[in-house]
């Protein structure tokens, strides 16, 4: 472990390499990291505090709101609105775009996040995480941010990543120049560089998909899953792994290689996919590509997609480049 390098030092080093940098991005990350530390503390004490279970509310996604979901969302909104570098935010838990109040300084960054991905698993102590995406508002724009400024393709992201709350708390992020991982050392309260320039293997031996939905899939999706049940090109038998927490399944795929799939199916509301583009599919696709991997909707590149709404859902196939391409080749036969 490169324990001598903190995330702040790493960010400042990156800032020095960019002559046009103003320090606003580093400031944004500082507040984002502080928010994650607060969330991590509550996640680690979840069994001892009154933060397990649901609130009784239903969010914009039609999902039951968990107490920790609500807590994480409030922490991020409170801390980030006061960062002085944002002009707007969007959260999985809110129907509308959240504009930074005129009572606070505003910048030109837009933060989009899923405050606690996988929160339905928190009661059984499964890894959860915070996924984030950072955009910059369009040049020349002033005043309140409009929705069209947020509906950008993933290729326009300034940075993206996630915090993973598990046996340890990790930050994995990219600003378009490599993917780096940091592990929180609770004894000093700092994220320390633990994974430098992460590269996903070209081909993996793990496929991850919820096969409980087999009866609801179309023919190309079934064929793709059957493909991964066969030995790989290296004649190695693949293993199936599915946690059910997107950020946990993706993190394993990033480090070990393979493919994670969340395809569309013919259930009500899932015909165009389930994962939210702006706060789930797009940021993870940005991480995957910067680590040498790939991400598609099964056929087309995820980062090229232009979302139509704040909570636009899409299918996702993400992971090792060869494995994602194999799925695309199967889908192309049925195009």
UniProtKB/Swiss-Prot annotation:
Pathway the protein acts in: Carbohydrate biosynthesis; gluconeogenesis
The places in or outside the cell where this protein is found are: Cytoplasm
Binding of substrate occurs at 117-120, 210, 242, 274
What this protein needs as a cofactor is: Mg(2+)
Pfam families annotated for this entry? FBPase, FBPase_C
Task: State the UniProt keywords alphabetically.
Answer: Carbohydrate metabolism, Cytoplasm, Hydrolase, Magnesium, Metal-binding
Identify the residues that bind Mg(2+) 1: 92, 114, 116
Assembly and oligomerization: Homotetramer.
- The protein's name is Fructose-1,6-bisphosphatase class 1
The species this protein belongs to is Lawsonia intracellularis (strain PHE/MN1-00)
